[in-house]
Every structure is written in structure tokens, then in C-alpha cells.
UniProtKB/Swiss-Prot annotation:
It holds the Pfam family Ribosomal_L7Ae. GO terms for biological process: translation. Gene3D superfamilies: 3.30.1330.30. The keyword ATP-binding does not apply. One of its GO terms (cellular component) is cytosolic small ribosomal subunit. Belongs to the eukaryotic ribosomal protein eS12 family. This is Small ribosomal subunit protein eS12y.
Length: 144
């Protein structure tokens, strides 16, 4: 190899996510993608005890609460902590849905979630990388 040859920089393929995620996505789908991406980066905490500790430390960026939680004191505590510490709070209709997003399930060979365990509350401490879905969630939070 002579010194006159230039070394070619490796070609990085464009991120496939930009082509997959439409700009007019609804907030629920955007929240699901945001939770899954945060989980991949280790930024999701599940359960009342861990969520309350993270909110108290003011390390939480977003709290997601299931509407069908059957413990009124649980809901009251999470809402009060989020209000006291200025943490944004979103709700989802089902604890099973939130549990699936949080990874509390088994994935079968076809990619479908099986044996989903309900999750009443989760807190995101690290969003990971900036995505279109995250921007949609942030716009929704800012508008409310």
C-alpha cells in the first residue's frame, strides 16, 4: 500500500427508523416506541417502590401510569409525587399494555407477547437517543 492512497471512510447506512415512523403518529404509538427505546438504553424503572425513589431523587423525566390500577392509594401517591417534583405524567388505558411495553412478558417465535404481566407505573430516567416518537411525546407533554 502506498502513502498516496486515501483511506475510504466506512459508509454508515441511514437510520431505518426515520423511514418507518410517520410524522402524524398518534401519542400512544409514540409513547410505546419511546418506552421501548428507553428500555433498550436501560432508562426504564418499573414498580411503585423504584418509581417513587426515582421521582423523589428528581432523576425522572417522565412517569407513565395505568388508568386501570385497582389501588386508589397507589394512583394518588404517584400523582402527588409527580405534581410535587414537577415530573410529567402520562396515563395509558391498561396495565397489561404498559407491562408489555416495559418488557414484562415473554416473546414467542412469531414476535408476539405472551404471558404479559401488568405494570401499574413506570418511570423513564433516560430517553436514550432522540427519535421522532420522542419528539411527538415531548410536543404532547408541552401542549398539556
Amino acid at each position: 500500500m502506498s502513502g498516496d492512497e486515501a483511506v475510504a471512510a466506512p459508509v454508515v447506512p441511514p437510520v431505518a427508523e426515520a423511514a418507518v415512523i410517520p410524522e402524524d403518529m398518534d401519542v400512544s404509538t409514540a409513547l410505546e416506541l419511546t418506552v421501548r427505546k428507553s428500555r433498550a438504553y436501560g432508562g426504564v424503572v418499573r414498580g411503585l417502590h423504584e418509581s417513587a425513589k426515582l421521582i423523589e431523587k428528581r432523576n425522572a423525566q417522565l412517569c407513565v401510569l395505568a388508568e386501570d390500577c385497582n389501588q386508589p392509594d397507589y394512583v394518588k401517591l404517584v400523582k402527588a409525587l409527580c405534581a410535587d417534583h414537577s415530573i410529567k405524567l402520562l396515563t395509558v388505558p391498561s396495565a397489561k399494555t404498559l407491562g408489555e411495553w416495559a418488557g414484562l412478558c415473554k416473546i414467542d417465535s412469531e414476535g408476539n407477547a405472551r404471558k404479559v404481566v401488568g405494570c401499574s407505573c413506570l418511570v423513564i430516567k433516560d430517553f436514550g437517543e432522540e427519535t421522532t416518537a420522542l419528539n411527538i411525546v415531548k410536543k404532547h407533554l408541552d401542549s398539556n
